[in-house]
Amino acid sequence: MGGKAQNGEDEARGKVLSSLPPSLVPYAELMRVHRPLGYYLNTSPYVVGVVFGAAVAPTKLPATILLDRLLILVLWSLFLRSAGCVWNDVIDMDLDRQIARTRLRPLPRGAVSSWNAVMLTAGIFACGGSLLSFLPRECAIEALIEIFFALLYPFGKRFTDFPQLILVNIGWAIPMSMHSLGLDPLAYKKPTFFMFLFIALVIVMIDVVYSRQDTEEDMKVGVKSMAVRFKHSIELLSYAFFYASTGALLAAGYYSGLGIPFTVLSVGGHFGGFLYFLKTTGVGKAPQVESYAKLACLIASLFWVVGLFVEYYLRV
């Protein structure tokens, strides 16, 4: 089963990359266009943030406004994710050469120069930044915070056992999405805090589980991570993040005054989707972790959004 799943993933990646001109393939690899999991994880918080903002806003927001903000923020998240991946490979090139799963990436194998990769990073960030002119000023400040942590992240694994905590910054998608709708997150302090915390816990949980597949090699080359630090209690840690994220989502709904649709669909979908992920992967032991993570994230995020959308739709 695991071998078939892995072969399926490799085939899908091959189809994506083979559809591009050969000269662009290494750059597409740097941007991880063939690895949709990261795009799910970076895009879904903005989608959730917009629908969450719509569900808690004092008046019912026009659907056209929501769709406009969704388009801009989803595009921003794609640029942010792509630039972060390229930058990560620039900083990690010496480490990637020593790890089996990463040693054939474009920079370690010499398909792209470091200078070109740095220029690509800057260009992608610039393209993403151009979108911010269509959003309120507060969104630009939050985007700068996200960029700062995206640039910082690859250094974390060299100096701390907790680099995954830097990924907490992805939770900034919630206040940024609310600001894009003209809402002040500070006017909804508890709901915003718990939704931010929810997103942060989910992202860290997935990254910790995903990192487990590299634990042995990471230890050999000196890469630090929570998966390495807690290698003997990774199941306990992962389930702690899972239950804490469920509690945070419940709290966000409670303090927002959201009702049964949110609790049943958003919270229930999250609980079922990621419990399935942890069980089927053995908390990162199974070889098809990425495949199950994509499925769990897709299912759970759909339920997050559907529950919030129903709450928005039912408003008078």
Swiss-Prot record:
Organism name:
Aspergillus novofumigatus (strain IBT 16806)
What name does this protein carry?
DMOA farnesyltransferase nvfB
Subcellular location per UniProt equals: Membrane
* Enzyme nomenclature, EC number: 2.5.1.-
Q: Which reaction does it catalyse?
A: 3,5-dimethylorsellinate + (2E,6E)-farnesyl diphosphate = (3R)-3-farnesyl-6-hydroxy-2,3,5-trimethyl-4-oxocyclohexa-1,5-diene-1-carboxylate + diphosphate + H(+)
Q: Which GO terms describe its cellular component?
A: mitochondrial inner membrane
Keywords noted in UniProt: Membrane, Transferase, Transmembrane, Transmembrane helix
Q: What happens when the gene is disrupted?
A: Completely abolishes the production of novofumigatonin as well as asnovolin A.
- Kindly list the residue ranges recorded as spanning the membrane: 47-67, 71-91, 115-135, 139-159, 162-182, 191-211, 234-254, 258-278, 294-314
Topology relative to the lipid bilayer, per the entry, is: Multi-pass membrane protein
| Family, similarity comment | Belongs to the UbiA prenyltransferase family.
Q: What is its biological role?
A: DMOA farnesyltransferase; part of the gene cluster that mediates the biosynthesis of novofumigatonin, a heavily oxygenated meroterpenoid containing a unique orthoester moiety. The first step of the pathway is the synthesis of 3,5-dimethylorsellinic acid (DMOA) by the polyketide synthase nvfA via condensation of one acetyl-CoA starter unit with 3 malonyl-CoA units and 2 methylations. DMOA is then converted to farnesyl-DMOA by the farnesyltransferase nvfB.
- Its EC top class is transferase
Q: Which GO terms describe its biological process?
A: novofumigatonin biosynthetic process; ubiquinone biosynthetic process
UniProt pathway annotation: Secondary metabolite biosynthesis; terpenoid biosynthesis
MF term (GO), any: 4-hydroxybenzoate polyprenyltransferase activity
